[in-house]
Amino acid sequence: MKIYLVGGAVRDALLGLPVKDRDWVVVGSTPQEMLDAGYQQVGRDFPVFLHPQTHEEYALARTERKSGSGYTGFTCYAAPDVTLEDDLKRRDLTINALAQDDNGEIIDPYNGLGDLQNRLLRHVSPAFGEDPLRVLRVARFAARYAHLSFRIADETLALMREMTHAGELEHLTPERVWKETENALTTRNPQVFFQVLRDCGALRVLFPEIDALFGVPAPARWHPEIDTGIHTLMTLSMVAMLSPQVDVRFATLCHDLGKGLTPPELWPRHHGHGPAGVKLVEQLCQRLRVPNEIRDLARLVAEFHDLIHTFPMLNPKTIVKLFDSIDAWRKPQRVEQLALTSEADVRGRTGFESADYPQGRWLREAWEVAQSVPTKAVVEAGFKGVEIREELTRRRIAAVASWKEQRCPKPD
């Protein structure tokens, strides 16, 4: 029996990055031998065991053979005669097909070290094309390591295009697509994930609502980058610097979906694209089974982001109504989330990357003023039933009006 550290732990250690999870491969052993040594078996489809002390995963070396469609159609073979090289060959990328023995020596049968040095994401073997999930995984790795200047090897991107055009991605379940997307949204450069999907044709298949934005012009006065798809990715890049939250990042990605519905004869204007985008957000989220809380924020951002841009022109009643519409009294975090997504929208434009966004500050200040109006005082004043709500709203509007007179500049 020989045990090797494999995959991401080896890769990230060589890149000087923190190692989160450690996975091990066991060569020359059997399930019974592992059980006798105190390991706990957890894998149903293939032999994976938990170490009795560390609870890290130890998998018997195995090979995989395509036996059906999609990413689940594989037959696994695990036996003492499966070599380490056999096991590493089934992995997706060469940088993930590295192993380390107990002496610290790196085993690299597929030039993963060279690709690490050259910052290349390259597939190990043609078997890559048998698993459509790998298209999403490579796009996610490209986003995860973009800050280290990694790029996808030309032949790997070509294979990803072939897989997409062959209809392989249609075998992916919504849950897997969303899981990879959610993971990509946590990276430092989530926009790279969607750019890679576009480069290989997968964006049109998996995210047609986003793909439809490319080639749709916006007024050059407000959008020097002109193309709405490019603006969307710039905005996603910007919000990744402002917030680590997946729901904020996803909402930003979806903020301009409505512009994809504008008839070409009306370009470059997109009047009413916010409310129009809400339906597309719902469509996308229903198809990918996006969690409700993430969906709800994306709907609100699509509907109201343009309203925040015009904040100085809003009357106090409209401002308080906005807080009602986003359910801020029960979910106050939405005020900050809306401020961040709107700021990213403004700064996600060519030449505006460092722009100030006072509307975000005014929104936050107005919220502090509105929520500081005490409900208790209204009740103690003798109001009952629906009168409490009406009087509370009246007092909130009055408080915001007083604040706006002093703190918010009047529109020209």
From Swiss-Prot:
Its cofactor is Mg(2+); Ni(2+). ATP binds at G8, R11, R91, R137, R140. It catalyses: a tRNA precursor + 2 CTP + ATP = a tRNA with a 3' CCA end + 3 diphosphate; a tRNA with a 3' CCA end + 2 CTP + ATP = a tRNA with a 3' CCACCA end + 3 diphosphate. Mg(2+) binds at D21, D23. CTP binds at G8, R11, R91, R137, R140. Magnesium is required for nucleotidyltransferase activity. Disulfide bonds: none annotated. GO terms for biological process: RNA repair; tRNA 3'-terminal CCA addition. Pfam families: HD, PolyA_pol, PolyA_pol_RNAbd. Keywords: ATP-binding, Hydrolase, Magnesium, Metal-binding, Multifunctional enzyme, Nickel, Nucleotide-binding, Nucleotidyltransferase, RNA repair, RNA-binding, Transferase, tRNA processing. Its EC number is 2.7.7.72, 3.1.3.-, 3.1.4.-. One of its GO terms (molecular function) is phosphatase activity. Catalyzes the addition and repair of the essential 3'-terminal CCA sequence in tRNAs without using a nucleic acid template. Adds these three nucleotides in the order of C, C, and A to the tRNA nucleotide-73, using CTP and ATP as substrates and producing inorganic pyrophosphate. tRNA 3'-terminal CCA addition is required both for tRNA processing and repair. Also involved in tRNA surveillance by mediating tandem CCA addition to generate a CCACCA at the 3' terminus of unstable tRNAs. While stable tRNAs receive only 3'-terminal CCA, unstable tRNAs are marked with CCACCA and rapidly degraded. Comprises two domains: an N-terminal domain containing the nucleotidyltransferase activity and a C-terminal HD domain associated with both phosphodiesterase and phosphatase activities. Monomer. Can also form homodimers and oligomers. Belongs to the tRNA nucleotidyltransferase/poly(A) polymerase family. Bacterial CCA-adding enzyme type 1 subfamily. This is Multifunctional CCA protein. It comes from Escherichia coli O127:H6 (strain E2348/69 / EPEC). The lineage of its organism: Bacteria, Pseudomonadati, Pseudomonadota, Gammaproteobacteria, Enterobacterales.
